[in-house]
A protein has these predicted regions:
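Non-catalytic, surface beta->alpha helical segment in thiol-disulfide oxidoreductase systems
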Residues: 18-21, 117, 122-164
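Thiol-based oxidoreductase modules, predominantly thioredoxin-like and allied folds used
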Residues: 62-68, 91-106
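"Short basic amphipathic alpha-helical interaction patches in structured regions
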Residues: 75-84, 94-97, 109-110, 134-136
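N-terminal leader/targeting and pre-domain segments
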Residues: 2-57
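Extracytoplasmic/secreted cell-surface and envelope-processing proteins
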Residues: 73, 104-106, 131-132
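Local sequence-structure signature of Cys/Sec-based thiol-disulfide redox active-site neighborhoods
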Residues: 53-88
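Short Fe-S-cluster ligation motifs
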Residues: 102-116
Length: 165
């Protein structure tokens, strides 16, 4: 007798619905995830000066690993989507994988990707990873946009792993 909608999984820690596996961005924009998704998306102002400075953002492949149960994912992923949209990246071309609390997806998309924290955004060119943003921007003064810009310049920032999860 579970209230978990079809296609979703129960978070063993909270009993709330969570997504697992590869999803489309629209799945985050519907109940029950839309309440946090929409708020964050609406509030975020994209730094268009920086996104416009990224040369040919379409030459890169983007993969987002997140947990719908994770506060950092709930904050950063709606922002990432807004940034991709500003850069003219079709979200259908962004691989979005939702993970459980052990950072695992049922089909194993995370294997070999060294996903320690969520969200993790991996940027690749010609099938080679050129940078990643892990959990949040790389420093107090960095933004998702500045980290993406640095990755595009070939100087990927070192991820800012926090001490606590």
């Amino acid at each position: 007798s579970s209230d978990i909608p079809e296609g979703m999984f129960e978070d063993p820690k909270t009993g709330k619905p969570m997504l697992l596996g590869t999803i489309g961005i629209e799945e985050l924009q519907q109940d029950p995830f839309d309440e946090w998704y929409q708020v964050e998306s609406d509030a975020y102002q994209v730094d268009t000066e920086l996104t416009n400075a990224i040369s040919d953002p379409g030459q890169y492949t983007y993969e987002v690993f997140l947990g719908t149960w994770c506060g950092d994912s709930r904050r950063e992923v709606p922002r990432m989507e807004k940034i991709f949209s500003e850069m003219g990246i079709d979200m259908a071309n962004v691989l979005i994988v939702t993970l459980d609390r052990d950072k695992v997806s049922p089909s194993g998309e995370q294997e070999g990707r060294d996903i320690r924290y969520v969200p993790t955004l991996i940027v690749s060119k010609d099938n080679q990873e050129i940078g990643r943003i892990v959990e949040s921007p790389s420093s107090e003064t960095a933004t998702l946009e500045s980290d993406l810009f640095e990755i595009s310049l070939g100087i990927p920032p070192v991820p800012n792993y926090s001490d606590i999860e």
